[in-house]
A protein has these predicted regions:
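Terminal targeting/leader modules
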Residues: 1-28, 34-50, 64-68, 84-106, ...
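Extended effector regions of multi-domain proteins
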Residues: 2-13, 35, 97-115, 138-139, ...
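Exposed beta-strand-loop-beta-strand "reactive/processing" segments of non-cytosolic proteins
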Residues: 47-97, 144-196, 243, 255-257, ...
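Hydrophobic or amphipathic alpha-helical targeting/insertion segments
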Residues: 87-89, 93-121, 125-129, 133, ...
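Short, non-transmembrane alpha-helical segments in secretory-pathway proteins
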Residues: 24-66, 116-155
């Protein structure tokens, strides 16, 4: 690809931009993060053993956001999670930056915080020095422990004797045979360690028996690729008149869209106060959980049921994006500012990419009688970030389409998690991708939290199914079919699964606002990637991921109900998630509601997924459904792209 000069084709928010607070929903600035840490550190209960899980904006009430006028004073408050290095438990604090005080504190004595980035980085060296782990490696022919690569995983909650009441991490290992080569081609099978993150001790080394370490290399870095295909001719994305969007204090406007871009350590990208042409669509949208269940019960692989958002926090794992590769075109970058365990400011430069893309044909019609044609091209605004969680990359894309649709796409790439087998004997739960190297069948199941506000906060939830009319007097030719709508008016009624047989879909409607046809304005959820979970609901992993049992859930808005697997779900028993929220069976008709959509990827591993996996994608769309009185893009000017030309004229 052709990469243009950074100074011409990209812009990153300046330090002054990052320090200016222009909107109540704007993420905390570096100065605010540091100030919050200082306020907490000077409070008597918190001392040298205190660490920070999260420091993030305490989002103001909706009425505050709705009534805000630019230039008005902005009250700033933070939500903080702190924990001790010595004891179990998490304390949730609310901190006023205006008053320099802690305004609220709540103890969660059995909770464990997310595993922190600093802990992950320390675990490898710690495990490599443990005598039992060294002995296990030696039994496999490894004498140089510097070649051993250790990936920490969350330990889950499996009631293993000796693990109760601890804060644990479980590890898998590989061997790197030479500098920079792909160590995932050399799994150290059957050797795992369990680490207590409070006492920093290896409480157990599990050795299930040695399998020869595969030695064939499978590399992806350019220095190892000796035979390369002929380069493709460049495609340049240029906007000679500049971009059509504007970013100020996180507030983004483009065409008829306006919204605020946020970011935190747990969810990564968050979107707020989403409006189209001044009409509200959603108050908040983000990806709030993902669980990755693996299908193998062999050795220590039964533990592979990781919640990348709730147990790790993908925001801290965001990449600094590279112009011309991660993002192509004329780019606006945003830096993000998070906290370290010690309360210092951690800045990830260019973590968010904003740009426009041509999106193909929007609409067209040729009147063959008059030989007249009208054509309009589509365009979309893209807001994205890419997070690396160990072996996998998760690329999050929010698309805002010119026709009023909102789309989320998750692209998964990186390297499959590998294990070893005897060559040619992968077993029933895996596929061999290299002699002696397997990838286990697994799933990536995601949950988006969509705090809808379709023309306001008073919304209802409607299910639509299509049925064939029974043959008979009303259907004499057997061709009749129709759509039936049902208002689901309580939380338990709205816990639903997809049904391809009836082409089921769901709408969020505002019963108080109607279109010209007299029907409620609405947005439709296009649930295109529903998956069937295979983990038993009654298993340890199934209880902790009960949200995957339905494809949609709808709850009455509660600001404390933020995550479908629970607020503190590291080592959780499954309580405190959305399955518990809906037991209240609150009314969800003509009120403030939250739509939770569960979708994902079913991934039987392919040979083509190794040594590095081409992107596979999943996602959903929110599309206007009677929100407008007609095609909202009928007013687009007719334009012809003058830069386009015939291929033969371009010298090919």
């Amino acid at each position: 690809m052709s990469v243009a000069d950074d100074t011409d084709c990209c812009h990153t928010a300046t330090k002054a931009d990052a320090l200016s607070v222009l909107h109540p929903l704007q993420a905390l600035t570096p100065a605010e993060i540091a100030k919050v840490a200082a306020i907490v550190n000077k409070d008597p209960p918190y001392g040298v053993d205190t660490r920070f899980e999260t420091i993030e904006l305490l989002e103001p009430e909706k009425k505050v956001v709705r009534s805000f006028k630019p230039g008005a004073p902005i009250a700033r408050n933070a939500r903080v999670g702190v924990f001790s290095t010595k004891t179990i438990g998490v304390t949730r604090l609310f901190v006023s930056l205006d008053k320099d005080i802690i305004t609220s504190r709540k103890e969660f004595p059995t909770a464990r915080p997310m595993i922190q980035l600093e802990q992950f980085l320390a675990i490898e060296g710690f495990v490599r020095e443990h005598p039992e782990f060294i002995a296990g490696c030696k039994r496999r022919g490894i004498t140089d422990m510097t070649t051993v690569c250790v990936d920490p995983w969350s330990a889950g909650n499996f009631s293993v004797p000796g693990e109760e009441g601890r804060h644990l991490c479980h590890v898998f290992a590989w061997q790197r045979l030479r500098e920079n080569e792909n160590f995932y081609a050399h799994p150290i099978e059957g050797l795992n360690a369990v680490i207590d993150l409070k006492s920093w001790e290896v409480i157990r080394v599990d050795d299930y028996g040695a399998i020869p370490i595969p030695i064939k290399e499978a590399n992806y870095e350019k220095e190892f690729i000796k035979t390369r295909r002929k380069p493709l001719k460049p495609i340049d994305v240029v906007q000679p008149e500049g971009v059509n969007f504007k970013v100020e204090g996180g507030q983004l406007t483009w065409d008829k869209w306006s919204f605020l871009v946020g970011f935190n350590a747990r969810e990564a990208l968050t979107l707020h106060d989403i409006q189209y042409d001044g009409r509200h669509v959603a108050h908040r949208a983000s990806l709030v959980e993902m669980v990755v269940p693996y299908g193998s019960p062999v050795n220590g692989h039964f533990r592979k049921n990781v919640f990348d958002i709730g147990e790790y926090g993908i925001g801290k794992l965001a990449n600094s994006l590279k112009l011309g590769c991660d993002c192509l075109g004329v780019i606006e970058y945003l830096d993000v500012h998070l906290n370290t365990m010690n309360g210092d400011v951690m800045t990830i430069e260019k973590a968010i990419c904003i740009h426009e893309e041509d999106s193909g044909l929007l609409w067209k019609h040729w009147d063959f009688r008059t030989d007249r044609a009208e054509i309009r091209r589509a365009r979309k605004l893209v807001v994205s970030t890419i997070c690396t969680v160990g072996n996998y990359e998760y690329a999050l894309y929010w698309y805002f389409h010119i026709d009023g649709a909102i789309e989320f796409e998750m692209k998964a790439t990186g390297i499959i998690n590998t294990a070893a087998c005897l060559p040619g004997q992968p077993g029933k739960y895996a596929r061999e991708v290299l002699p002696g190297v397997v990838g286990h069948i697994h799933q990536h199941i995601f949950c988006a939290r969509l705090d809808m506000a379709v023309d306001g906060d008073q919304n209802s939830f409607v299910e639509c199914n299509t049925y064939a009319e029974p043959e008979g007097p009303e259907n004499p030719y057997g061709n009749a079919f129709y759509e039936s709508e049902t208002v689901l008016d309580t939380e338990l009624k709205a816990a639903r699964r997809a049904n391809p047989a009836s082409h089921r879909y769901w709408k969020v409607v505002n019963p108080n606002k109607t279109n010209y046809a007299g029907t409620p304005v609405s947005y439709k959820l296009e649930a295109m990637n529903c998956v069937t979970p295979f983990v038993s609901p009654n298993s340890p992993s199934g209880r902790r991921s009960s949200f995957v049992q339905n494809h949609v859930w709808v709850t009455a808005f509660d600001p404390d109900e933020r995550y479908p697997a629970g607020e503190y779900m590291n080592h959780s028993d499954g309580a405190g998630g959305i399955a518990d929220f809906v037991k209240q069976d609150r009314g969800i008709k003509n009120t403030d509601i939250v739509l939770w959509h569960v979708f994902g990827l079913h991934h039987p591993v392919r040979l083509e997924d190794f040594p590095v996996q081409p992107c596979i994608s999943t996602g959903f769309k929110l599309v206007p459904h009677g929100f407008f009185d007609g095609n909202p893009c009928i007013d687009l000017p007719a334009e012809v792209n003058e830069a386009s030309c015939c291929a033969h004229a371009a010298g090919t």
